[in-house]
Amino acid sequence: MRPALSRRFFLGRSLVAAGLVSSTRQVSAAAATDDDQVALEHRLDEVLATPVLRVDSLDKPVVIASMELLRNGRNFVVRVRTSDGAEGIGVPNAMHLVHTYPIFLNRVAPFFVGKDARQLEPLLWELYRHNDNYKYQGLALWVCVAAAEFAILDLLGKLSGRSIGDLLGGAKRRQIAVYRASGNRGNTPEVEVAYLKQLVTDSGARALKFRLGGRMSKNADSLPGRTEKLIALVRETFGKEMTLYADANSSYDVAEAIKIGRLMEEYEYAFYEEPCRFDHFEDTKAVADQLSIPVAGGEQEFSDYGFRWMIKNRGVDIVQPDLHYHGGFIRSLRVARMAHAAGLLCTPHMSGSGLGFLDAAIFAACLDNPVPFTEFKGDTDIPVSSATSSLKCENGMITLPTGPGFGITIDPTFISKAVPVTSF
């Protein structure tokens, strides 16, 4: 059984190699004392209290006059307008908003009408408190909040002439290296490898992620023996030059998760996502403490303080806020900055739907502590273009758009044909 330090040392070496922390910090992390832990807690609280949004260039109130939810086919669009006629557009997670839209219409959108959009960041807390909205905390509330935040950020960007990345502290990079992810489970290892080959052919990606286990399955595999065979076969097929990640989607208890993790270590995988039940923080930590492979998690977490626990206690090595499930860019960047303060990495979880691939790229561009590759799913049916980016994965990279707001144009005909969604 490997001591917990082995994982810290493994992660520390990776961080040092990436230039994200110094070797001195690595050594000090290994020899952490109670005083160090108290100091870390203070740093995390300081990060949570530090503003993310930068709107200093807007010296007059930006009063929101309306916030609409529009639907075109299976896609939604949020349109926010000011009393002066300025407009911002956001594309929410339609996969979930189709079920939760009454919360958006009845609780989220009305709250923002009449408010100064420049105060978006403190308003997120006021919205949480307003009308007992905190009782709805979870995906149902935060997907709706993210939908509103995206549109307001686009509005603020267009009014200030700044990109969303600039509003959030500045993009550190325009070229984002991506990994392609398979959502398959239950097919044979041979069929899955053929699918992964096609993803690489289509994108030029130098990193891949696929699924293990059976999803919340109490150790059951989707097919008998699939996981073990697939872990080996993918590495043997793509060789050591391909970076490999794998996602268990809460499939295992601690013992089984460690067993699978050991196999992933043998085949030199780069991270192991959500090995145990996502809400069993202690189980995930117990697994991570026994493995050298970095453990990633946080996709389902909707609380800043849930992430604070993970980071403070080293429950994971890589935090994965979902930009929709966690309520938008601002809240997710707080998580990333807490992780950075603790010497951990961050990568956005991409829940698919809408323009999630673009959201993930913008977020990754703003990180001081990204993993080398960011998830890309560019299979949108929304007609969108950019003058500064193809919005496609080319040679394993996506180029971040420049320009105000999201830096994109959604076909005006698509917007004009979208039907307002009203409360019932």
Region locations from a protein language model:
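Conserved, mostly hydrophobic/aromatic
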Residues: G85, A148, G161, L208, ...
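Metal- or metallocofactor-binding catalytic centers and their adjacent structured scaffolds
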Residues: H42, E87-L159
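Glycine-rich, aromatic-flanked loop segments that form ligand/cofactor-binding clefts
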Residues: E149-R185
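C-terminal segment of N-terminal export signals and the immediately downstream linker at the start
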Residues: T24-R71, E87
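Metal-dependent enolase-superfamily TIM-barrel catalytic cores that perform enediolate-based chemistry
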Residues: R174-Q290
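Shared catalytic-loop signature of beta/alpha-barrel
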Residues: K115, P122, Y136, R262, ...
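C-terminal extensions of enzymes
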Residues: S14-A17, V384-F424
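N-terminal secretory signal peptides and thylakoid transit peptides that target proteins
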Residues: M1-A18
